[in-house]
Amino acid sequence: MAAGKFASLPRNMPVNHQFPLASSMDLLSSKSPLTEHRPDAYQDVSIHGTLPRKKKGPPPIRSCDDFSHMGTLPHSKSPQQNSPVTQDSIQESPWQDRHCETFTFRDPHLLDPTLEYVKFSKERHIMDRTPEKLKKELEEELLLSSEDLRSHAWYHGRIPRQVSENLVQRDGDFLVRDSLSSPGNFVLTCQWKNLAQHFKINRTVLRLSEAYSRVQYQFEMESFDSIPGLVRCYVGNRRPISQQSGAIIFQPINRTVPLRCLEERYGISPGQAREGSLTEGRPDVTKRLSLTMGGVQAREQNLPRGNLLRNKEKSGSQPACLDHMQDRRALSLKAHQSESYLPIGCKLPPQSSGVDTSPCPNSPVFRTGSEPALSPAVVRRVSSDARAGEALRGSDSQLCPKPPPKPCKVPFLKAPSSPSAWLNSEANYCELNPAFATGCGRGAKLPLCAQGSPTELLTAKQNGALGPRNSGINYLILDDDDRERPWEPAAAQTEKGQWDKGEFVAPLLETVSSFRPNDFKSKFLPPENKPLETAMLKRAKELFTNNDPKVIAQHILSMDCRVARILEVSEEMRRNMGVSSGLELITLPHGHQLRLDIIERHSTMAIGIAVYILGCTGTLEDRAATLSKVIQVAVELKDSMGDLYSFSALMKALEMPQITRLEKTWTALRHQYTQTAILYEKQLKPFSKILHEGRESTCVPPNNVSVPLLMPLVTLMERQAVTFEGTDMWEKNDQSCEIMLNHLATARLMAEATDSYRMNAERILAGFQPDEEMNEICKTEFQMRLLWGSKGAQVNQAERYEKFNQILTALSRKLEPPPVKQAEL
C-alpha cells in the first residue's frame, strides 16, 4: 500500500523541504522548521517493503506526541526541541558518526511518523468502506440465531473498558463485552446511580459425564444455558444484578457497526487481552508501531490465525502490524541494501528489584531475506516476562501454521507473587456472590471455583482449599468417591433430635430392595415353600374369583401407592429421600433402587396374571371366565382407580404371546362374554397403545390419575445397554425417538404434579377398608414366593424372568398344542 506512494521516487535525490511528504499524508498538523542540512548529508531513500531500516548511529531526538488509539489525529503536543528532527516520512537524518554499529534500544513512547503512516494507511483501508456494506454486514450478524451472542446488538465484542464506560450514559444502560483480563469470559457493563459498573458473568462448566459437559452463566442467583437468556431474564424482570449494588438494567446500548470493525478499530485481539488491559485506563497513550523484539513477539503470539483480512495484508517482505507492548525488550534491526537481517538473540532490559534474572547472551546467527525460517520457534509468554534466545519469525512465515514449541533451555524469569498491574485496571469488577448448590457437592469439601482447568480443581480439592474467585470458570464435578461415600443424615438433626426443615439434609442412597420375600410373614405360605404350589394357586384363584373387580382394583391401587411412595410416606422417609414423593425420586439419580422395585412389582404382577390364566384353570370355559375377570379388573384400574401403572401390567399379561396364541380361549370369550371382548378390543388396546406412545395427556384427565404410567421412564433409566432383544413395542416404532422424548417430558410433568397424584389417590381410597387375605395376595413379596419359591425369589431378576418365560410357554402349549404339520409326501 505504502510502496505505491514511493514508487516514483528515485533512490538518490535530495528531498525538498518546502513540500514535505509527511504533510501530503496528513500525518502531522504542524512542526517546527527543519534545521538546514547539506544536500549530500541525506541518505538514500529506502523503498524496500513499507518500513525503512534503521540507520547507524544514535536515534534522533524527536518530540513526543500522544495520539489517540486510532493513530490518525494528534491529542496533544509537548514543547518542541531545537534539536534536528525528522519530518519527512521516508527521510533519515544524517549521522555524525557513521562508524557506530551498536544496537540501541528505542523508547516506545517516541513517535516515528513513517511507522505511524503504515498504521494510518491500514486503518484508512479498514474504515474507508461504504456505509451500505457495513450496514449489510451488521444486518447479517443480527440475523443469526437468537442463541448466538453476535446476533444481539447489545454485544460489543472486544472493546476496552474505558470505551464501554463512555457508551453507558444513563441509569439502566447496559452492554455486554468480552473480558480482556480473562479471555473467554464476558462482562456486563452498566450504569447505575451515575456510576459505571462492571459485572463479570460467572461461567460454570457442569461435567455430567466424561464425554458430556454443559456450560451455564449466572450473576448471583439463577443460572442460564446462554448469555442471551440471562440478559432477557434480568431485563424483563427488572431483577437486580447483585444484592450489594442493586443495579438494574433495562436499556440496551446497541452497536452500529459489525464486530469486526470494532475489533480492528481498537486493535484488540483475543490473545492481547492482558497486554491491552494495561493501557485501557490511559486512552491518551498511543498504540504505535514498534520494531522492538517485544512488539514482534507479542504480535506473533496474539495475531489470530483465522483473520483473513490481516493475513491478506501481509505479503512479500512486509511485516505485520506491530502494536506497542509494555515490556521494553527492544532490539534494533540492521539494514543492508534490500536484505533484512533479523537477529535471533535478544538482550534483556534491566529488571526491577526482586526479580531473579539470568543474562542471555546475544546470538550471532541472523536470517537474511524474507524467506520463512525452516524451524521457527513459537515465542511463548510466561506471566509478565518472556523467554530469551528463541528465533524471530519472518513476516511470510506467519501465514503458515505455527509448529509445536521446542523446549527452552533458558530458565524462566519468575515474577514476584504480588498482584500484577493489569489486575488494577481490567480485572476490577463489582462483587458477586453466586449461589451455588452445596447439596450435591457438600459445600466446603468440594471447591466450586478453580482457575485454569479441572486438574487444578482436583488439586485444590485434595488440599481442601477453595479456588480463587476471579477465575470466571467454575467446574462442578461429582466423582465416584462422592457417590459411594455414606451420607450423614444425622448431622442435620438438632440437639433435640428433630429435623430442621430449613436446613438441607443429604438424601440417603438406598442399596437394598424394599421387597424381602424371605422375611415376609404370610398366612398362606409356610416359611419355606416350593414354586407354584397347587394349594396356594387354588387359594389365590378363589380370592380373585369371589371378589368384585372394583374391590380387587382398590387393593391393587392401595399397594401401588405404598410401593411408589405416594401415600403413607413418613417424615423420616421424606428426609431420607430428599423429596416428598417417590414419583419425584424415580427421576433422580439416587432413586435407582426404587426404580428397580417398580420394575420388579410390574413384571411379577404380569407373570402372576399369566399364571392365573394358564395354570389355574381346567376347562375352556374356566379360562374364558378368568380372562373376562382380568379384563374387568383392567377396566376398573383405568376408569375408577386411575392406576395406569397396574393397568399396564395387566395389559402386558393379556398381550403376552403365550396368551394371545390361545385362539380357542379368545373365541370362547367372544361367544360367552361378548361385551367384555368388545371392550378389550375397542377401548383397552387402543388406550394402552396411546399410553406407551406418550400421548396420554390428550386422552387422560389429570384429575383422574392416581398412579401415572411409570414403566417407560424407569425402563429407559435403568437399561444398562441398547439391545434389540426384549424391547417394548413402542421402542420398535418408526417414531421411537419422538416417543422417548414424550416420555421424558411426561416425567418432568409427573415430578411437578406429585401433590395432585397424592390427593387423587386419597380421594379414591377414602373410606376403603382392605381385606387382609386379599391385601396379602396383592403384595409383591407374596407373588414372588408363590411364583419362584423361597429360594428362587433371591435369584437375579433376569434369570428368574427368563426361566419363567419358558414355563409359561410350556403351559400354553399344554393347554392348546400347536397344530401338527402334515408329513411331506
UniProtKB/Swiss-Prot annotation:
Primary site of residence: cytoplasm
Residues where Omega-N-methylarginine is found: R442
GO biological process, one term: positive regulation of cell population proliferation
GO molecular function, one term: guanyl-nucleotide exchange factor activity
Annotated Gene Ontology cellular component terms: cytoplasm; focal adhesion; membrane
UniProt-annotated stretches for the region Disordered: 31-93
Site residues, Required for interaction with NEDD9: R748
Limits of the Ras-GEF domain: 548-818
Highest taxon above the source species: Eukaryota
Disulfide bonds: none
Residues bearing PTM N-acetylalanine: A2
Keyword Cytoplasm: yes
InterPro entries linked: Ras_GEF_dom_sf (IPR023578), RASGEF_cat_dom (IPR001895), RASGEF_cat_dom_sf (IPR036964), SH2 (IPR000980), SH2-Ras-GEF_adapter (IPR051853), SH2_dom_sf (IPR036860), SH2_SHEP1/BCAR3/NSP1 (IPR044102)
Localization annotation: Cytoplasm; Cell junction, Focal adhesion
Residues modified as Phosphoserine: S32, S78, S83, S182, S290, S358, S363, S375, S471
Annotated Polar residues bias: 75-93
Keywords per UniProt: Acetylation, Cell junction, Cytoplasm, Guanine-nucleotide releasing factor, Methylation, Phosphoprotein, SH2 domain
Swiss-Prot/TrEMBL domain comment: The SH2 domain mediates interaction with tyrosine-phosphorylated proteins. However, not involved in the binding to phosphorylated BCAR1. Required for cell cycle progression in response to INS/insulin. Required for regulation of EGF-induced DNA synthesis.
Subunit structure and binding partners: Part of a complex comprised of PTPRA, BCAR1, BCAR3 (via SH2 domain) and SRC; the formation of the complex is dependent on integrin mediated-tyrosine phosphorylation of PTPRA. Within the complex, interacts (via SH2 domain) with PTPRA (when phosphorylated on 'Tyr-798'). Interacts (via Ras-GEF domain) with BCAR1. Interacts (via Ras-GEF domain) with NEDD9. Interacts with PTK2/FAK1. Interacts with PTPN1. Interacts (via SH2 domain) with EGFR (when tyrosine-phosphorylated).
Function: Acts as an adapter protein downstream of several growth factor receptors to promote cell proliferation, migration, and redistribution of actin fibers. Specifically involved in INS/insulin signaling pathway by mediating MAPK1/ERK2-MAPK3/ERK1 activation and DNA synthesis. Promotes insulin-mediated membrane ruffling. In response to vasoconstrictor peptide EDN1, involved in the activation of RAP1 downstream of PTK2B via interaction with phosphorylated BCAR1.
Protein name: Breast cancer anti-estrogen resistance protein 3 homolog
Species: Macaca fascicularis
Gene behind the chain: BCAR3
